[in-house]
């Protein structure tokens, strides 16, 4: 849900990790299989590097190299660390060398940082959004 809100067939936006091309997976079950595989690999890598599991979740958005970055910078995913990685690693690798930002109007993002994201820099609030969505699922499952 965090990725696409269920609006595309690649519900977990896992195409890039599989083929390197966005939206190349057109089957929801395949998207989920690929997404679970990537998250599982990230969790194993996070355990190997002795970082928190939320680093693995954030790496689902940024890519596996984020796990090593966190391991070298305190071992715990934070919005501040994700912001630095987005600005200094992800965004420049995809052409944003000027630090250009835009506003991401999403409640969790607005709460944690005014909604600012770096253009081509991934989502620095991704792990927090997943945490919030898990909270909502737990809350509504009790009704």
Name each model feature, range by range.
Residues 5-6, 17-33, 37, 41-143:
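Non-catalytic cell-wall polysaccharide-engagement segments
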Residues 12-16:
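Conserved catalytic-core motifs characterized by acidic clusters
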């Amino acid at each position: 849900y965090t990725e696409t809100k269920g609006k595309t067939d690649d519900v977990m936006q896992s195409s890039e990790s599989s083929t390197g091309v966005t939206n190349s997976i057109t089957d929801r079950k395949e998207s989920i299989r690929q997404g679970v595989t990537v998250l599982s690999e990230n969790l194993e890598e996070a355990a190997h590097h002795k970082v928190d599991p939320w680093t693995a979740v954030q790496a689902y958005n940024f890519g596996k190299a984020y796990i090593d970055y966190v391991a070298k910078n305190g071992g715990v995913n934070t919005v501040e660390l994700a912001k630095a990685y987005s600005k200094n690693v992800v965004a420049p690798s995809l052409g944003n060398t000027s630090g250009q930002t835009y506003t991401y109007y999403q409640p969790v993002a607005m709460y944690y940082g005014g909604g600012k994201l770096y253009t081509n820099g991934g989502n620095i609030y991704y792990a927090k959004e997943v945490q919030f969505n898990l909270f909502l699922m737990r809350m509504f499952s009790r009704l």
